[in-house]
Amino acid sequence: MTQAAPVTFSTVRENYFGPPAEMQALRHKAPVTRTAFADGRPGWLVTGYSAARAVLSDSRFTARGEREHPAVPRAATLEDERCRRLIAGQFTARRMRQLTGRTERIVREHLDAMEHMGSPADLVEHFALPVPSLVIAELLGVPPPDREHFQHDTLRWGGFGRSTEEVTEAFVSLGGQLQRLVRLKRTEPGDDLLSGLIAADPALTDEELASIAFLLLVAGHGTTAHQIALGAFLLLEHPDQLAALRADPALTESAVEELLRHLSVVHHGPTRAALQDADIEGTPVKAGEVVVVSLGAANRDPARFERPDAVDVTREDTGHLAFGHGMHQCLGRQLARIELRVALTALLERFPHLRLACPAAEIPLRHDMQVYGADRLPVAW
């Protein structure tokens, strides 16, 4: 089903957490519809769950049509089949167990620092942003003496309210750090992802390895940081769900899946390009046309989820698309789940009286960014 006139994207969320109202309406009226990109190019917008799942699992649509980060070298992308295969081989069960323990330590140290600093505190600045960057440092094998520098540049590059000059400077510094890290791993390999990639394929160039490391940082830092902060915000705004989770910690895994479904922090994406003439549930798409999938709208589809707009930490019906679907599903999804589970569990245990330190309406939200989140989240305990 299509609309006669193209629609443009909206990014203003409903009630802090829901997808834009226009997306919800489109899902009901035209789950596959014509749209127009900012540069005027026509394309397609998918808002229905079944249509989204169909596109993401259809080999006629390629992820290589995605617009790459302008600062990322083209030596490697997370959509290259060879690159994805090599990286996937490094996300082993053993490595995830190791990273669980390290994540617990990182989370504990940051909660200690927050508690020492005293109430109130900004949960974004002091917890949600730094924890994922240090977990990625562990994943890549950044030596302990270099982690403070790595953390500093990561937060300058990925933080909020930074000038263009500061972001550029941090990016250049991060690039240099990653290139030096690759050279170190060639001569002094360790039990980390970069060393594993070098052992798995010695033909990988230094440029490819540094590019992979940067892309993992891009993919794994902001999304996880915003999910942690918004997850805490969502629970604090739904005291019945917070009480249920506190009463039964065994609900943590289902709660994490529900937060992922309900929040879907990526505004619009993933993006696919048609390799050939194809169709999406009967809607014809010409070769070369670009398709954008609204994961947030798809994850609220009443045709797939019962009471889709309700937050329910006991929900057993998962199947959400927060990490995408099919051959290009997020490679780091298990690590992201570990971080969310560990971070939220420890946060709620440490601060049993955690609450917002300002009215919810005063929390600055990132409606205009590709990844939705809070610039700040003042909390008290």
From Swiss-Prot:
This enzyme's EC code(s): 1.14.-.-
First-listed, main subcellular location of the protein, grouped into a coarse class: cytoplasm
Assigned keywords, A-Z: Cytoplasm, Heme, Iron, Metal-binding, Monooxygenase, Oxidoreductase
CDD domains the record matches: CYP105-like (cd11030)
Family in the record: Belongs to the cytochrome P450 family.
EC class (word): oxidoreductase
Gene Ontology MF term list: heme binding; iron ion binding; monooxygenase activity; oxidoreductase activity, acting on paired donors, with incorporation or reduction of molecular oxygen
GO cellular component annotations of the record: cytoplasm
The protein's name in its UniProt record: Cytochrome P450 105C1
Lineage top rank: taxon: Bacteria
Annotated InterPro entries: Cyt_P450, Cyt_P450_B, Cyt_P450_CS, Cyt_P450_sf
One Pfam family of this chain: p450
Subcellular localization: Cytoplasm
Cofactor(s) required, per the database record: heme
Sites where the protein binds heme: 330
UniProt cross-references to PANTHER family, sorted A to Z: CYTOCHROME P450 YJIB-RELATED, P450, PUTATIVE (EUROFUNG)-RELATED
Organism: Streptomyces sp
